[in-house]
Amino acid sequence: MADENTPVMPEEVPAVEGVGM
């Protein structure tokens, strides 16, 4: 689920591709 650009659980940054949830 973790993208190469986005962290596993982005808390400070909004979910770009809905990775946060």
Curated annotation (Swiss-Prot):
Known partners and oligomeric status: Heterotetramer, composed of two GyrA and two GyrB chains. In the heterotetramer, GyrA contains the active site tyrosine that forms a transient covalent intermediate with DNA, while GyrB binds cofactors and catalyzes ATP hydrolysis.
Protein name: DNA gyrase subunit A
EC number: 5.6.2.2
Keywords: ATP-binding, Cytoplasm, DNA-binding, Isomerase, Nucleotide-binding, Topoisomerase
Catalytically driven reaction(s): ATP-dependent breakage, passage and rejoining of double-stranded DNA
Top EC class for this record: isomerase
Main function: A type II topoisomerase that negatively supercoils closed circular double-stranded (ds) DNA in an ATP-dependent manner to modulate DNA topology and maintain chromosomes in an underwound state. Negative supercoiling favors strand separation, and DNA replication, transcription, recombination and repair, all of which involve strand separation. Also able to catalyze the interconversion of other topological isomers of dsDNA rings, including catenanes and knotted rings. Type II topoisomerases break and join 2 DNA strands simultaneously in an ATP-dependent manner.
Keyword rRNA-binding: no
Further details from the record: Few gyrases are as efficient as E.coli at forming negative supercoils. Not all organisms have 2 type II topoisomerases; in organisms with a single type II topoisomerase this enzyme also has to decatenate newly replicated chromosomes.
Region entry Disordered, spans: 1-21
Organism whose genome encodes this protein: Streptomyces niveus
Primary location recorded for the protein, binned into one broad class: cytoplasm
Gene assigned in the entry: gyrA
One term of GO molecular function: ATP binding
